[in-house]
């Protein structure tokens, strides 16, 4: 219906010989402002040098008649509000029943090649709750963007080079020796997590004390420990519903000479200089807002973390992606300007990189704060979260707030089986519809394919029909704004509309024609609930 209104406006503008204007149509929050509204008249004020209400009148007078439109009105300074005939709203049901699992698809992405990199936790320990939020948000965003016509690839960057891996090796060797009964003390800045103890025991069980005789002990442990940690990370992410297209090794950047190539590229562009024995990147001259220049190679010859990151992002862009999306934690906020500066320095555009920042998660249980501490072995992990509330609830609660806002996650609420639990409220709507459809199947031979949608004129049916029609637009908005929480908001609204409908209408009655129209309506709701839940990686149970 929204597309039809855009076409009607385009037809009117063509008659008025007005071309090259983007037409925006929205769904007003207040029903008094119609079913759809456009500000096109106000957009044209500067061009036509007329009062927007006068322009609105001219546009309306040239809109072709359409049997689905009840009336068109001018509101406020020049909004054009469209009121759709209630009997026409039912056409969305046919669309949903035909599209089924494809309902919600749109082409706002137009095939744009996007690389989404997320979680990318160091392979030095168990994933914590901050990683869980990143995972739930990013995987949902990937699903939404794919539904919206983006050609998207999902990537995990394995930080298998650098000091954190040196610490991992030291920690693993100490735990291995301790497992053998030897005296060995874990340094204070080493990794103290339970997973490293398990790793030490695993090394002992598999190799006995034979590793102590190896000259390449550290090199062997390095490869073994990284592989072990990545296996655990992949297992946890898989159980959380995540899949990746590519796992990219930081170490491969060095092995394949990509770091040197990136440095050569920066030198060729003329944005590096030497000072105090170090090599610097002149980020302050690149217009991305960095407040000071950044070191690439230290005076002792070692590389900074930024240098390998620059090489990685050059590699991403060289692979032909139009847009890079990096999802990082709140502690990386100051990193954005220097990263953007680095790709500008290599001849790319700053807007080819978007860094999405995840804010912190606070865990609660019945309103009381649950403390986290990563290096003491007492951190609440992603695995703990899955075991405590289940993957569905964990994902839903981690996605339902905007990524740039702090999130309180209450275990007690997530486990409640009541309307106070937003996920339960949504999933129960789906299960309730499945129950009604089973009853209908047992009670009679109903045909929902050619039913009379004009019978769906009561206020609760109309509200449902409008909400159903909004779904593709909501998906497109969630994709272009990188805001998966819009899907959760939509699910709450759709579930609420359904529960109101159910409480005020008896679906299966002796009136077969009315029953069939209601069954068609709730089937469309069921499909849309399922499709929306799938976008955030949550199941749609048929029984609860």
Task: Identify the function of each model-found stretch.
Residues 1-90, 101, 105-544:
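Non-catalytic interaction-recognition regions
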Residues 91-96:
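Short, charged, solvent-exposed linker or helix-capping segments at domain edges/interfaces
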């Amino acid at each position: 219906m929204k597309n039809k209104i855009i076409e009607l406006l385009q037809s009117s503008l063509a008659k008025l010989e007005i071309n090259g204007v983007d037409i925006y149509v929205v769904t007003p929050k207040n029903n008094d402002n119609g079913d759809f509204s456009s500000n096109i008249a106000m957009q044209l004020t500067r061009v036509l040098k007329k009062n927007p209400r006068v322009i609105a009148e001219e546009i309306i007078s040239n809109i072709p008649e359409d049997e689905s439109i009840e009336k068109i009105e001018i509101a406020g300074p020049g909004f054009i509000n469209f009121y759709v005939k209630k009997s026409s709203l039912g056409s969305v049901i046919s669309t949903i029943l035909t599209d089924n699992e494809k309902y919600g698809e749109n082409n706002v992405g137009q095939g744009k090649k996007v690389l989404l990199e997320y979680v990318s936790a160091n392979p030095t320990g168990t994933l914590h709750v901050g990683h869980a939020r990143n995972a739930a948000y990013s995987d949902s965003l990937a699903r939404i963007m794919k539904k919206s016509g983006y050609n998207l690839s999902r990537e995990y960057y394995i930080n298998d080079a650098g000091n954190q891996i040196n610490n991992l090796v030291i920690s693993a060797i100490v735990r291995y020796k301790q497992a053998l009964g030897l005296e060995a003390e874990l340094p204070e800045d080493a990794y103290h997590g339970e997973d490293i103890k398990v790793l030490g025991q695993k090394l002992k069980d598999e190799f006995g004390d034979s590793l102590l005789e190896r000259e390449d002990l550290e090199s062997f442990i390095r490869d073994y420990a990284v592989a072990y940690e990545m296996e655990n990370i992949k297992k946890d992410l898989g159980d959380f519903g995540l899949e990746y297209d590519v796992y990219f090794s930081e170490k491969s950047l060095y092995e394949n000479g990509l770091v040197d190539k990136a440095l050569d590229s920066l030198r060729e562009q003329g944005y590096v200089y030497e000072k105090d024995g170090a090599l610097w990147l002149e980020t302050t001259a690149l217009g991305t807002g960095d407040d000071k220049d950044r070191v690439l190679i230290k005076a002792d010859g070692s590389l900074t973390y930024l240098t390998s990151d620059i090489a990685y992002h050059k590699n991403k862009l060289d692979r032909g992606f139009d847009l890079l999306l990096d999802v990082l934690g709140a502690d990386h906020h100051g990193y954005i300007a220097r990263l953007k500066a680095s790709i500008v320095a290599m001849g790319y555009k700053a807007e080819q990189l978007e860094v999405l920042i995840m804010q912190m998660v606070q865990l609660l249980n019945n309103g009381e704060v649950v403390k986290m501490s990563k290096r003491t072995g007492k951190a609440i992990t992603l695995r703990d979260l899955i075991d405590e509330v289940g993957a569905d609830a964990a994902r839903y609660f981690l996605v339902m707030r905007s990524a740039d806002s702090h999130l309180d996650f209450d275990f007690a609420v997530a486990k409640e089986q009541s309307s106070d639990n937003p996920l339960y409220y949504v999933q129960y709507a789906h299960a309730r519809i499945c129950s009604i459809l089973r009853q209908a199947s047992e009670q009679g031979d109903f045909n929902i394919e050619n039913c009379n949608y004009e019978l769906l004129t009561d206020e609760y049916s109309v509200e449902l029909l409008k909400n159903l029609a909004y779904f593709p637009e909501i998906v497109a908005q969630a994709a272009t704004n990188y805001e998966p929480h819009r899907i959760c908001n939509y699910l709450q609204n759709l579930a609420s509309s359904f529960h109101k409908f159910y409480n005020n209408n008896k679906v299966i009655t002796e009136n077969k024609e009315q029953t069939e129209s209601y069954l068609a309506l709730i089937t469309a709701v069921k499909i849309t609930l399922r499709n929306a839940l799938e976008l955030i990686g949550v199941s749609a149970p048929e029984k609860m």
